[in-house]
A protein has these predicted regions:
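Short, hydrophobic beta-strand segments
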Residues: 77-81, 140-148, 178-181
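Generic structural motif
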Residues: 122-124, 176-180
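DPxDG-like acidic metal-binding loop motif
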Residues: 1
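Histidine/acidic-residue-rich, glycine-tolerant segments that coordinate divalent metal ions
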Residues: 4-137
Length: 181
């Protein structure tokens, strides 16, 4: 901003510096627009969006025309089962095994269900389940991040994950009240 103001004679127009909150969870821009940003300030003729990148060395600036980064969705899945003692796994519906099956299935979405000319990323970033060596828990929680450039691919990916989770629950003989959320 200071650099632009020092060179004000070299450009003309309105300068709006906007720091977007909650950009990683996808709600920041939506909330700014709902709050009336374009009623309070003039619409800019040009937009310049900045974001840090693990690909760039500190102090370097990268640029691309058009799309620079994909949209992001966070998805939480609770894989439910019926816990029990580790010595009697045959009396349980093990959510750790089911969660690992789901994770392996999810890894095929981009390579086998999304068109090769589209871009998508599905990452399982967190798995939480169980607290003891010899106890099968009642549930496992997964945290995923999804990235895509279009709403069509976004919706398709979410739909596939839901289908896989329901199919896995059915294949493991779970009653419908224990299907993943």
């Amino acid at each position: 901003a200071m650099n632009l103001m020092e060179r004000k004679a070299e450009w003309r127009g309105n300068l709006i510096i906007l720091l977007q909150p909650a950009e990683e969870v996808g709600s920041g821009a939506r909330n700014i627009i709902k709050a009336g940003i374009f009623e309070k300030f003039p619409r800019p003729d040009f937009n310049l969006a900045l974001h840090v990148s693990a690909d760039l060395v500190a102090g370097k600036v990268g640029y691309v025309p058009g799309w620079a980064m994909a949209n992001v969705d966070s998805l939480d899945i609770t894989v439910k089962g019926r816990g029990g003692h580790g010595a009697y796994p045959h009396t349980t519906k093990d959510p750790i095994v089911m969660a690992s099956q789901l994770i392996n299935s999810i890894q095929t979405i981009v390579s086998r269900e999304i068109a090769p000319i589209e871009a998508a990323v599905v990452t399982v970033g967190s798995i939480h389940g169980g607290t003891k060596h010899n106890v099968i828990p009642n549930e496992v929680r997964l945290q995923l991040t999804l990235r895509s450039y279009t709403d069509e691919v976004r919706n398709q990916t979410i739909s596939i994950i839901r289908r896989m989770a329901r199919g896995l629950a059915e294949a493991n003989g779970l009653p419908k009240d224990l299907y993943p959320e």
